[in-house]
Amino acid sequence: MKQKGVLGELVRARLTSAEYDGLTKETVEKFYIEEYGQLPPPFEIIHSDKLQIGEESGFNGTAVHFFDENQGINEVYVINRGTEGDLSKFAELGEKWLETLKKYKQNPENLREIVFSGNEDIYTDAYEVLLGDDQSQIRDNQKFKNEVIQKVNEKNLSTKPVFFLDAHSLGGNQGQTLMVTSGDLFTDVNVYNDAPMNVYNIVRMHDKIRKTVEDKYGILADEHDIYKIKPSELYSILDTELGSYASKITYYRNEEDLLTNLTLPYAY
């Protein structure tokens, strides 16, 4: 049974959509009043960019913390947005293709900065979601989560905080990975037209699974040898460790959405 909180399913979905424009106090109040006919409990909005998180990786997320000591309210809604990009940036690179090629050949390790500047999410779609070869945005998501927890705890409320998570598209991939690498932190998770988790990202980011795989196969998870292990060989390990999370997550999918119909090679 889904955990009931201050926000219902419709408001959570609307806030996830509005996150792309940057959530404001006015937006949260507007949606709440339209749904419930009254002002929401006191709340604070925490933005990842205000904490200087995601400046290099392109990660962008928001948390809304509702709190009222008298009513025993202490709820946190973490929201992860999906892919954003500026295709004109690629056009500019095309016009300077020779200069771009020289920069890349001199510093191939700086591919994201050279080719994907301003399009970090598209880099993440390829190298994190598809290949599982980069975890920069996932790590920044974890940093953001830790900062949010710290800010919530600083209020010293007597009621234990309850954490919810909503995520769309690319954010769905990261949100699910955040959920399974955060123990029992998140009580209820909604994902909308999500990109699936990547098997190799989970192995690399989940401490217990990482150790199990490294011990069983005699490899280091961060090395390229991990790709010698077929995803099908890893599924049973992941199922055993992560099966309990299934009851916490709800998938909202539009069957006409392109992402929903894609079959990714390393998906979990």
Predicted segments — roles?
Residues M1-G8, Q71-I73, F163-A167:
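Solvent-exposed, charged interface segments at domain starts and junctions
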Residues M1-I33:
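N-terminal low-complexity, Ser/Thr- and acidic-residue-enriched intrinsically disordered segments
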Residues Q3-K4, G37, D125, D257:
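Helix N-terminus capping/helix-initiation residues
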Residues A13, G61, V76, I249-T250:
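A broad, low-specificity signal marking well-ordered, structured residues that form hydrophobic/aromatic
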Residues T24, I33-F164, V180-D188, N193-D207:
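A conserved cap/lid and substrate-binding interface adjacent to the catalytic center
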